[in-house]
Structure formats: structure tokens, C-alpha cells
UniProtKB/Swiss-Prot annotation:
Annotated positions binding [4Fe-4S] cluster: 36
Pathway assignment: Porphyrin-containing compound metabolism; chlorophyll biosynthesis (light-independent)
Coiled coil: none
Entries under HAMAP family matching the protein: ChlB_BchB (MF_00353)
Domain of life according to the entry: Bacteria
Entries under InterPro entries matching the protein: ChlB/BchB/BchZ, LI-POR_suB-like_C, Nase/OxRdtase_comp1, P-CP_red_C, Protochl_reductB, Protochlorophyllide_Rdtase
Protein name (record): Light-independent protochlorophyllide reductase subunit B
Active site: 290 (proton donor)
Single GO BP term: photosynthesis, dark reaction
Cofactor(s) in the UniProt record: [4Fe-4S] cluster
Cofactor: how and how many bound: Binds 1 [4Fe-4S] cluster per heterodimer. The cluster is bound at the heterodimer interface by residues from both subunits.
Length: 523
């Protein structure tokens, strides 16, 4: 067991809550102690929803453990069914309740209800939130469609031609507490409609049990978020022959690949690549003169598997950045992230420890960080611009405006969100350079979000004394003055290289001349 003040994912029952809260006519009875009801806040505070999640907690207390907690479970299940009248009931237990082994799912199935009951057995001590969401969606899909499985009749992706209608697809994976899922769905539906393709069902977001039963009315499935939907897509392919897409339409190239993959599976004519590229401003903006100085900028990426892999491809192939770090907390997608990292000649970081991520960030010395809410905090401490690309996120990353990550408009949003911090960083450096002018004063608040620059900390963000790990290094006044002229987003790297050079040459004091010599040495 590990004690930490931050975690990238909650326990698996939070993933189950995400699926239940995303859907209609479903209720989730969770066998849990009083303290586990905190999860409600994730939906009302971060997602800013106007209603509570459809979850009933048994909320047992310490004094209940001496009695029959199974009766408490049955009482809560009965009351939830009578009050909410769901079409499908999910039953599970939290990490604490798992230790009691009351088997709430088995109890619910023995109560004689005339509705589908999904027994969620989510191992809380070995799995986490995204796996819990994936397993819940998979079990729900399987429960509602298992009676319709036919081993003789498989769904053909060309069936729409025989029926004389437009092709239909399902969009699977978007859920509450996902990163910009609501807007991604709108954007992808718009793109598909432009290609003459209708959307049959979007699930789990906004779907009902009746919609899940209609999944087999479509020709293929769009696996929009692999962490949530891949297991369900595999089951549908195995039992109904339904093909599904593998390309995630984040970025211009991926969106074009996605459209062509859908066309190939449905036997539609392929589209013109140049014509599609003009639908977003990102290609032109990234080629414009104003963006030339962005080429080769060092970027560190960490997030869920879907967004981290897509971000790496956009950074390298569409914006001309140099990816110096890539990682994920999603162990289920570790293989894909490692493969992407290998293509970029970097070592993948697979961890759920934010301190390891921050340490890797320091060593990589990036000029831009793309990550989660925690990487934003770490980047502030290190004085590096950051843009959030993945959950877990803060309420400020759930905008009221239309702000997708996928498709053409998503590419526009990404360009703004990634490039503007770098532009602001350049402006920040100019302010730092000319702060001796009367228009500027020390202590001026930075618009990057971190606190004003403290001249005592300008050389080091995390050390009080200026020491190298091998021996003490003394910076002279001239050396300090010259180092402050270096843009803050590369200052850490310049300082490290200069100290390495000083140790290599046996120089006890670093002056401005030493800094110049070090620059020439490492050039």
C-alpha cells in the first residue's frame, strides 16, 4: 500500500459510477461505508452537472459490522428499485466493502426483480478507475445483448447497401469525467454526417439500456476511447462480427486516417486528402512565419494512453516539436505507449506516481509540458509552460464553450492550447529581461499562473542552496546576471550544462565567461 496526496485514477467503483452517471434509466447500488460517498463531488463539482449521480450507497458504519450487513444491502437495493424504477440495475461494492464479502450482486439477483441485474465484481486492490469503467460497460453490453447472439448470422459492414439506406455506426467510449467527451462526440458526428454516415447509438454517454440493445442495428463501431470501449468492441466483434475502428481522430493526420478507415470498412470511396486538410486551420498556422520559432521546441507528454499517444504524433508530425518524454498512468495501454515512445527514440514512463513524473520532467528539461492537472502543478513549480491534454482534470478544463480535442475543430483548439503557452513564455522572458525599466517592478504577477519571479529562486526552483550533486558550485554575480538573461523555459538546462562543464574543467566559480565557454562546448 502506498500513501500519496495525489492519484491519477480512483478505485474501479468510481469507473462504474462514471458509466452509470453517463447513462439514462440505470441505477447503481454501491455497497460502501459512509466515507466513500465523496465520489458524488466529482460529478457535481468537476463536471458541473445539475443532478446527482444515480447511485445509492448502503453507507454502513462501524457499528453495523457486528450485525448482518447483508440485510442492509438488500434493504437498500429494494428501496432503490422502488424509488428510481430503473430499467437495468448495477450492483457492486467499494474497496472497503470488498473486505466484508457480502456478495451484493448475488443478493440482488436472488431478490426476484423483473429487470436485468449486472453484478460488478471489480477488484479494488489490483485495478483502477479506467479499468472499472471499461469492465462495467463491457458487462452491461454483454448482459443486455447475450440473448441476441447468433453464431450463424454475422453483421456485414456492407449490409447498408442491401437495405438501401445510409450506413450506420455506433460511437462507443465517451463518458462523464472523460476529457472533452461531450464536444468530441458532436465533432465526430458532424464529420461522419458530412461523409454520408449516420450515427446509430452513442454510448455510454447519453445512452439508455434500450440503446445498448440497438447497438447491433449499426454496421460498425467507432472505438473513440480505447480505455473505455475496446473490451466491448472486441466482444461485439467476436459475437456479432461487428468491425471497429482503431484510429483515434485527434490531430489532422489521425482524423484523415480515421475517415479513410471508416470508408474502407464500409466500402465507401476514399476522400481527397488535400481537400480534408483545408477543413482545419492547424496545417496553415503551423507552416506560417509566426510559428517558425516553435520548430524543434522540446515537449514532455504524460496522460491517459489515448491522449498521450495522439499528442506525441501531433507534436512530432504536425507542429515540428521534439518529444523528449512520453508516458502514461494507464497500465492497460502501456504496450501502445511503449511502441510510440520507441518510434520517437525516448523511453516510455509508465507510472501512477506523480513524483516520478515530475522527476522525469526535470531531467528532460522541456520547453512545454502536455499533461494532466498534476503536471500543470509540477510545471508551475519548475517554471515551464503547460497545457492540460488529459484527465484527471480541474474544473477549469471543463469549459462551458464548445472545445473538442477530436476532428477539425479539435485540431484548432489543440493549436491554440499548445502554442499560446509558448508565446506567453516568450513574452514572459521579455518582461524578465527588461524588468529594470521603470515600467516593470519586481513582484509583478505573471500571467502564466505561477507566482511572480523571486530573484532568490531564479537559478533553482527546488533547492535553497546552489549545490551540484557532486560538489558545491559557486555562481559569481556576473554568472548570475548572465543566467537570468536566458529564457526561463531553457534556463534549467543551461544551468545544468554549465555546472557539468565547470566540474569537468575543475572550475570552482562560474562567471559569465564560464557560461559562454560551456555554451560553446555543448553546441
Amino acid at each position: 500500500m502506498e500513501l500519496t496526496l495525489w492519484t491519477y485514477e480512483g478505485p474501479p467503483h468510481v469507473g462504474a459510477m462514471r458509466i452509470a452517471s453517463s447513462m439514462k434509466d440505470i441505477h447503481y447500488v454501491l455497497h460502501a461505508p459512509q466515507g466513500d460517498t465523496y465520489a458524488d463531488l466529482l460529478f457535481t463539482m468537476i463536471e458541473r452537472r445539475g443532478q446527482r449521480p444515480p447511485v445509492t450507497y448502503t453507507t454502513f458504519q462501524a457499528r453495523d459490522l457486528g450485525g448482518d450487513t447483508a440485510e442492509l444491502v438488500k434493504k437498500n437495493i429494494k428501496e432503490a428499485v422502488e424509488r428510481f424504477k430503473p430499467k437495468t440495475l448495477l450492483v457492486g461494492e467499494s474497496c472497503t466493502a470488498e473486505l466484508i464479502q457480502d456478495q451484493p450482486g448475488a443478493l440482488a439477483k436472488g431478490m426476484g426483480f423483473d429487470m436485468p441485474i449486472v453484478n460488478l465484481e471489480l477488484p479494488a486492490y489490483s485495478k483502477k478507475e479506467n479499468w472499472g469503467a471499461s469492465e462495467t460497460f463491457y458487462q452491461l453490453t454483454r448482459t443486455l445483448l447475450k440473448d441476441k447472439v447468433s453464431f450463424s448470422d454475422k453483421i456485414s459492414p456492407f449490409r447498408w447497401k442491401e437495405l438501401g439506406r445510409r450506413p450506420k455506426v455506433n460511437i462507443l467510449g465517451p463518458s462523464l469525467l472523460g476529457f472533452r467527451c461531450r464536444d468530441d462526440v458532436i465533432e465526430i458526428q458532424r464529420i461522419l454526417s458530412e461523409q454520408g454516415i449516420d450515427t446509430n447509438v452513442v454510448a455510454p454517454l447519453g445512452a439508455s439500456p434500450d440503446d445498448i440493445e440497438r447497438l447491433i442495428d449499426a454496421e460498425i463501431n467507432i472505438c473513440l476511447y480505447q480505455e473505455i470501449a475496446e473490451a466491448s468492441c472486441e466482444w461485439l466483434k467476436r459475437n456479432f462480427g461487428m468491425e471497429y475502428t482503431n484510429t483515434i481522430p485527434i490531430g489532422i493526420k489521425n482524423t484523415i486516417e480515421f475517415i479513410n478507415e471508416v470508408h474502407e470498412k464500409l466500402d465507401l470511396p476514399l476522400t481527397n486528402k488535400e481537400e480534408l486538410e483545408n477543413k482545419s486551420k492547424l496545417p496553415w498556422y503551423s507552416k506560417s512565419v509566426d510559428s517558425n520559432y516553435l520548430t524543434g521546441k522540446r515537449v514532455f507528454i504524460f496522460g491517459d494512453g489515448t491522449h498521450a499517444i495522439a499528442a506525441a504524433k501531433i507534436a512530432k508530425e504536425e507542429l515540428g516539436f521534439e518529444v523528449v518524454g512520453l508516458g502514461t498512468y494507464s497500465r492497460e495501454m502501456a504496450r501502445q505507449v511503449r511502441a510510440t515512445a520507441k518510434d520517437l527514440n525516448v523511453e516510455a514512463l509508465i507510472t501512477n506516481n506523480y513524483l516520478e513524473v515530475e522527476d522525469a520532467m526535470k531531467k528532460a528539461a522541456p520547453e512545454l509540458v502536455l499533461g494532466t492537472q498534476m503536471e500543470r502543478h509540477s510545471a508551475k513549480r519548475l517554471g515551464i509552460p503547460c497545457s492540460v491534454i488529459s484527465t484527471p482534470m480541474h474544473v477549469q478544463d471543463v469549459p462551458a464553450r464548445y472545445s473538442p480535442q477530436m476532428g477539425w475543430e479539435g485540431a484548432n483548439v489543440i493549436f491554440d492550447d499548445w502554442v499560446h503557452p509558448l508565446m506567453m513564455g516568450l513574452e514572459e522572458h521579455l518582461i524578465d529581461m527588461f524588468k529594470h525599466d521603470f515600467e516593470f517592478v519586481d513582484g509583478h504577477q505573471s500571467h502564466l499562473g505561477h507566482t511572480a519571479t523571486n530573484k532568490n529562486n531564479i537559478l533553482n526552483s527546488d533547492e535553497k542552496k546552489e549545490k551540484n550533486s557532486k560538489e558545491e558550485i559557486i555562481w559569481t554575480e556576473s554568472g548570475r546576471a548572465e543566467l537570468t538573461k536566458v529564457p526561463f523555459f531553457v534556463r534549467g538546462k543551461v544551468k545544468t550544462n554549465t555546472e557539468k562543464y565547470a566540474i569537468l574543467r575543475g572550475i570552482p566559480e562560474i562567471s559569465d565567461e564560464t557560461l559562454y565557454d560551456a555554451k560553446a562546448y555543448f553546441s
